[in-house]
């Protein structure tokens, strides 16, 4: 699977369902973000980037490439 680009709509497993949003930032080095008061970390590299995603409801998440798939 190739890397995603900014603006790509993606989804991921979340609880018993899925989350969905649009990629707004891409990281190829380890990253730490404070999201809703929590420090979220992801290891990242050129082969396994991390993605900062804005969900459809405006919430933001940080996900690794391996956690994502293209949304329809």
Where are these regions (language model features)?
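Short beta-strand-centered aromatic/proline hotspots
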Residues: 19-26
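Intrinsically disordered, low-complexity, charged/polar segments
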Residues: 41-72
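Short, conserved beta-turn/loop elements at beta-strand boundaries and strand-helix junctions
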Residues: 26-32
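Short, surface-exposed loop/helix-turn segments at secondary-structure junctions
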Residues: 33-41
């Amino acid at each position: 699977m190739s890397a995603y680009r900014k603006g790509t709509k993606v989804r991921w497993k979340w609880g018993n369902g899925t989350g969905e949003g649009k990629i707004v930032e891409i990281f190829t080095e380890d990253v730490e973000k404070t999201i809703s008061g929590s420090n979220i970390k992801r290891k990242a590299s050129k082969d396994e980037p991390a993605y900062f995603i804005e969900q459809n409801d405006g919430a933001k998440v940080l996900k690794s490439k391996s956690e994502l798939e293209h949304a329809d």
